Structure formats: structure tokens, C-alpha cells
Amino acid sequence: MARQFPLEKTRNIGIMAHIDAGKTTTTERILFYTGRVHKIGEVHDGAATMDWMVQEQERGITITSAATTAQWKGHRINIIDTPGHVDFTVEVERSLRVLDGAVAVFCSVGGVEPQSETVWRQADKYGVPRIAYINKMDRMGADFFRGVSMIADRLGANPVPIQIPIGAEDQFKGIIDLVTMKAMIYTDDLGTTSDVADIPGDLVDQANEYREKLLEAVADTDEELMMKYLEGEELTEEEIRNGIRKGTIGLKFIPVVCGSSFKNKGVQPLLDAVVEYMPAPTDVPNIKGVHPETGEADERHSSDKDPFSALAFKIMADPYVGKLAFFRVYSGVLGSGSYVYNSTKGKRERIGRILQMHANHREEIPEVYAGDIAAAVGLKDTTTGDTLCDDKAPIILESMQFPDPVINVAIEPKTKQDQEKMGTALARLAEEDPTFKMHTDQDSGQTIIEGMGELHLEIIVDRLQREFKVECNVGRPQVAYKETIRRAVKSEGKFVRQSGGRGQYGHCWIEIEPLEQGSGFEFVNKIVGGVIPREYIAPIGQGIEEAMQNGIQAGYPVMDIRATVYDGSYHDVDSSEMAFKIAGSMAFKAGAAKADPAIIEPVMKVEVTVPEEYMGEVIGDMNSRRGRIEGMEATGTAQIVRGFVPLSEMFGYATDLRSKTQGRGVYVMMFDHYEEVPKNIAEGIVAKRAGA
């Protein structure tokens, strides 16, 4: 089968936004208009095609990024619908990594909400060109122009409207296209029929004002256009469109369109904008990587002729075909049944079938080309972020970084059968989601699961019950405390065991010192003159790392330290790797106790939006939770309070906030950094762990 759509006519886009700005509804409408769905699914009916997990349909939120493909005006658009809830940031992160462009959906009433900022920063990090779509223009309090100025103020972006609305709230009738200077007025409910008319008289001045701003932005992208514009010549429609495309792809500005997806208004012009202004795989820079053996920089061009390279960005357990690996092809061609080389793991794997996904129904295809997004069956060893490539031209593409979990709960299976199933089920879920981790607590023998927030873990437990039929009891959420040291010390570890036959001998001197937050663990070898043979150096590091897992004061993992081994001694006969591992562990324990140890806790960035009359109460409550207020701002009738609060003080906050504000307050929080726990609280934590 030859390529259906040329690379220039392929668009890989994501739909990203705050919860409830209408991402999934917008995607549903796109699928309806491009002929992929014959009946529109509504999120609030639990029937949206993209929200295919049971948990999503019940909660009306999108958890996993469903990938689907649609066609519009001779172009193929691969769409990834991403979740807006902060606990699922990992899904947004991995989607943005493999996209070429994104549609950022904003609610015309709420404008730029906290999660929009997080997602926006993630898109900035990957340099993803964007179109802003201001949705819900039919809602009470809709204000397109306020939305535009919020994008400029709160996101520091340069928004340029290429449309303006005709009316707002229940008077929202259509849109004015500032490129053609025509009005598009909707005449039926499905938004499939619309009349193109002249601009209503009362909006002519406003349309001219915004067209002038658009022309200015377009002229800025190109010197010839700038000269033409400054000399007062009229720019042609084609020149304007080319200028918008150039400005968007070059990240100079963000074109802004508007509509009401629920009322089917503005979705086709949004699709036109995606096709006209979003980059094709050939418009974005070549994908960078390194050669797995030499470590030298390498790259691949978006072309079918280059050697095959792809990035696996999501692993999913599927009830019918087993493990599905979603991947984005950057270069080359791949046929089903062929072998690929997983350069991250150093393994050859066979691709069984290649599927093109439409939310949760799938179509088998014989091969994929550069620029495609598809799912493969049969990749047993591949996990998120792995590179798949041609083994004759190996490359490791830049992967993604995922944050460490900040919250954990203990779970116990209800029966013996559940016990066996639970291990396999958790391993499958951990494969799908890199921010979900699990381990067994050494002391209690309990299984501990860790994640990015309460909702994240709730959904994991829910999936255990539904998909894997594992019934389990869940403990109270616990904070992922860590320990660290505050000053550098030198210490000795000596392990000598002399019993009949061969003895054990390991001896080392180490220096441990604190590092900056987020540095992890560094192990440095400064042994000279062979006082400790080379083969015993690594075991010392392993011994230190193992001791770090068991903490200093309260048994929490130790982070952000550098350990340097600088002296020691060995015995020709009695020394062994095991003896030096124990010596390393002993040296760390002896030193850490004298290094002014401290317990540190995750601190969350919190934003609370409340009506003005509850401000005092909310600020007082935040202070009582050891919070630090960073700032406040007014938006319409509400106030936003921003601050940092330790995670341990935030459990149950949703209920408290609801009762304090009569259900009118909302909040979001995301992990920000670790901070030292105050002495009185640290003592309580140590005592509790000792008592446990």
C-alpha cells in the first residue's frame, strides 16, 4: 500500500487545555465533521468517543491521551486528546513530545485557568506551535477579548485573533473571518450550514481594528511583506495566510479563533486553521538523537527515504490484543511483521500488527510512513520513551522526563487469589504509566503504590477492580517524605569477620556532602594508588545507595547527596565485593547520623479561586496549613489566591474548601519542590515511625 497522504499534507496535533474547557467535546466535533463518527457523542452523556475508559465516562474527564486520525480537505490530521487534570500531567508531557502542533482550548468564561498555564509551559518546553481556540462562546459571561488579553498577560504569549465573534452568550451567531473580511453566520443546529455574508454594520469598526493588528503581525514575519505593508499596499489573501503560517510555525505569535463546540459553531473554521497554519512534519526541525554506541550527536529528517526511526510514547494494556505500544514515526517506513531495533534497551523486537487508532476502534494497516502515529502489537520489551529504529542505522532519540511520585498509599488484597493477580496487574499498570510506581515495604510487608495525586491513585485502584478483577483494601494516603543532610562529614566503615576458614574484610573512608535539590545521588571515586582495588569500588557505592533507601532518622529515602570514597584498605584473601558493600553501608550510616540530618517534605503550588467574600477565610485557612501566600489577583467576580502549602496539610482540603465557600471555591495544586520540615513536626514524624 503506497502512502495515502503526502508528508506535507499530514498534521500531528494535540488538543490541550484546562479541565472542562471543552477539549473532548471539540475533538468529538472534529471527528463528526471529518466523517469519522456518524452520531456526535456528548461528554455529559458519558458517550464521547475519545473518552473510552469507564472511569472517564463516569467522571466526565479525560485520563489517557486517545490517539485518532481524521481527514479534512485532502489532509490527514492525527489528533491526540490530552487530559487537563494536573494528576495526569505525564499524559500531556508525552503527547507534546511527539506532536508537531497543538490546539489550546480556553473557556471564554474562565479564560486562562491554572492548569492551562502548566500545559502551556510544557508546550513551551518542547517548542510546540499553537493555535488558541476560545470555546464556549454561548455561555453566560463569555468574553472573547478578555480571553485574548489573559493569554497575553498570564501566559506571556503573543495572541493574534484571526477571527472575532458575532455576539456572545445566547446571542452568539457566528464569526467574522479577518482574512477574508466576511461574516459566517450559522443557520442550523449542527453548524454544517452557514451563510457567508457581509460584516454586520455595528461590527465593521471592530473588525477593521483587529484586521489591522493581524496585518501588522503578518508583516512582521517577512521583510517583503513589511515593506509592502509600510508602503500602504494591500496584502493579498494568500500573502496573509502564508504570513500567519510562518508566524505560527516560527513561534512568533498564536493565531486565535473562537466558537462553541457544544453548539457546533466554529469547529470547521478551526479545522481549516489546523490545515492551513499548523506545521507538517517537514516544517519542524529534524529530530535529534545520539548514536547508542559512540554517543555522538545524530539526527533524522522527516522523510520516507531516511532510515526508520520512531519513539514509543505510550504503552497500553488492551483487553483484546494485549499490550499496545503507541509510536510516532519520525523517518523511514515500517511494515507489519518486520523487525525493529529497540536502541534504548539494546534488543531486537518483531512488530506483529500495526493498528491505526480511532479512539477505541482500530483499523489494521500494512505499513506506516514518516510522520504517522500508530500502535503496534507484539513489542514485549518496549516501554514509554524508548526509541525504535533500523538496526543498521541505530539512534537513540531524545526522550521525556517524568517527575517522581509525591503521594503513596498502602494496598492489601482481600483474598489469596487477589494476592496473586494484584502483582501482575500492578506491574501492567506501572508499564503504562511512568509516574506510577510500586514497592513492598520492608518492615510491614505491605504493597505501597505511589503517584502524582489522590485522583491518580484512586483511578489506579479503580482500574485494578474493573479491568483486573482485583479487590483490595486501601490505606490512608501518605506523604512521600524524604531525608537529606545539611553538612559534609567524613566517616569510616570497617567490616571484619573472622571465623573458621575464609574471613571477610572490607574497609573504606568516605565523605558525604549535601547537594542542590533535585540532584539525586552522586558517587565519586578518589582512590589512588590502589589502596582499594577497582573491583571493590562499585560495591561500596551500592552499599551506600542501599543504606540511603532506609533513611537516617525515620527510615525515609535519602536524596541529594554526594558520596566520595577517598581511602581504605583491603586484604588479599579475605576481601570480597560483599564485604566492601557492607563497609560502604556502615560508613554511610555512621556519617549520616553526624551530618545534621533533616526530614524534607513535598510542597505544592496551590491556586484557589473563590468569590471575594470568602477571601479572608481562605487565606486564614491557608496560613493555618503552614501555607505561604505568594500573591492574589482578581478575575471578574472571583479572586485567585496563589501560594505554597506542604502536601501533608492538603489532605481533605477539597471538602473543607467546599464547606467554607458553600461549594463555590475551586482549587488546583501541583508538586513544586521539597522543603525542610519544621523541627516540632519532624519530631512527631520520627516518633510516629519509631512507634509504628
From Swiss-Prot:
GO terms for molecular function: GTP binding; GTPase activity; translation elongation factor activity. Residues 8-282 form the tr-type G domain. PROSITE patterns: G_TR_1, G_TR_2. Keywords: Cytoplasm, Elongation factor, GTP-binding, Nucleotide-binding, Protein biosynthesis. GO terms for cellular component: cytoplasm. Residues 285-304 are annotated as: Disordered. GO terms for biological process: ribosome disassembly. GTP binds at residues 17-24, 81-85, 135-138. InterPro entries: EFG_II, EFG_III, EFG_III/V, EFG_IV, EFG_V, EFG_V-like, EFTu-like_2, G_TR_CS. Residues 290-304 have a biased composition (Basic and acidic residues). It holds the Pfam family EFG_C. SMART domains: EFG_C, EFG_IV. It is found in: Cytoplasm. HAMAP family: EF_G_EF_2_B. Belongs to the TRAFAC class translation factor GTPase superfamily. Classic translation factor GTPase family. EF-G/EF-2 subfamily. Catalyzes the GTP-dependent ribosomal translocation step during translation elongation. During this step, the ribosome changes from the pre-translocational (PRE) to the post-translocational (POST) state as the newly formed A-site-bound peptidyl-tRNA and P-site-bound deacylated tRNA move to the P and E sites, respectively. Catalyzes the coordinated movement of the two tRNA molecules, the mRNA and conformational changes in the ribosome. This is Elongation factor G. It comes from Desulfitobacterium hafniense (strain DSM 10664 / DCB-2). The gene is fusA.
